[in-house]
Regions:
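Short aromatic-rich membrane-water interface segments that cap or initiate transmembrane helices
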Residues: 1-3, 63-72, 129-148
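Interfacial "cap-and-anchor" motif at the non-cytosolic start of specific transmembrane alpha-helices
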Residues: 2, 6, 16, 47-51, ...
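Intrinsic-disorder/low-complexity, polar/charged segments
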Residues: 4, 29, 53, 57-59, ...
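Hydrophobic alpha-helical transmembrane segments of multi-pass membrane proteins
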Residues: 6-26, 31-57, 65-82, 99-118, ...
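Membrane-interface helix-boundary motifs at transmembrane edges
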Residues: 22-35, 85-96, 162-175
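Membrane-interface interhelical loops and short amphipathic "cap" helices
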Residues: 51-65, 123-136, 198
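Membrane-interface elements of multi-pass transporters and channels
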Residues: 54-58, 87-91, 117, 124, ...
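The cytoplasmic-loop to transmembrane-helix boundary for the fourth helix
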Residues: 85-141, 173-183
Length: 210
């Protein structure tokens, strides 16, 4: 399983970088610029997952990888909403992004100071999971706020897609379906992971890449 996880992470990084090159070589539209940011922050997230996978001998080492992951997730959530708004012609007001930025600031301060307070993680310990070690955490109030934010973003996108679909052109409808399908897969992964279906394995890299 360790080598499968390694291969998935590396494949995801290479795929994202190749898509980034394709977009940058064009004259980017607003939707493409949003995708570039989405792509960059997804790569940052996957690098964090890889760091956690390779260096988790101590809580401090594993936490370094987690910090990189949350930097990626913070930018990913804002870029995802912007990309969905531009690509599927959803109308997302500007103040939503301001709220996102404020939440992400609190989250990043929380995770970068997680060793010194219980607000992001209540507890952290290293577990041996066969061929690799991993960190096991218990989420605190800021951690819960982050995932409420993530759920709110995914739900908002799905609702906006549903509202806009009937009044859209054929081309717009196709784009809306793409966004709704990709967003739905990501949401499903989070739900199944929360229910413990995947055990210690977290397929979030696959979901974000899709």
């Amino acid at each position: 399983m360790f080598y499968v996880l390694e291969a998935v992470n590396i494949a995801a990084i290479l795929l994202m970088l190749s898509m980034l090159v394709v977009v940058i070589r064009q004259q980017p539209s607003r939707a493409q610029m949003a995708f570039v940011l989405y792509d960059v922050f997804t790569v940052i997230f996957v690098i964090g997952v890889q760091l956690e996978l390779m260096h988790a001998d101590t809580v401090g080492e594993a936490l370094s990888g987690l910090c990189v992951q949350y930097v990626g997730q913070a930018g990913f959530l804002m870029a995802l909403l912007w990309f969905a708004s531009e690509f599927a012609y959803l109308k997302i007001p500007g103040w939503i992004y301001i709220i996102q930025a404020a939440i992400n600031t609190v989250v990043l301060v929380g995770v970068f100071t997680a060793e010194h307070n219980p607000y992001f993680y209540n507890s952290m310990k290293i577990l041996n999971d066969g061929m690799y070690q991993r960190i096991n955490v218990s989420g605190g109030i800021i951690w819960k706020m982050h995932y409420i934010h993530m759920a709110a973003v995914l739900l908002t996108i799905q609702i906006c897609c549903g509202v806009r679909y009937r009044q859209s052109t054929a081309t717009q409808k196709k784009r809306i379906l793409y966004i709704a399908a990709g967003n739905g897969i990501f949401a499903l992964e989070l739900i199944l992971k929360g229910l413990g279906v995947f055990g210690s394995y977290n397929p979030v890299v696959c979901a974000m890449t899709i």
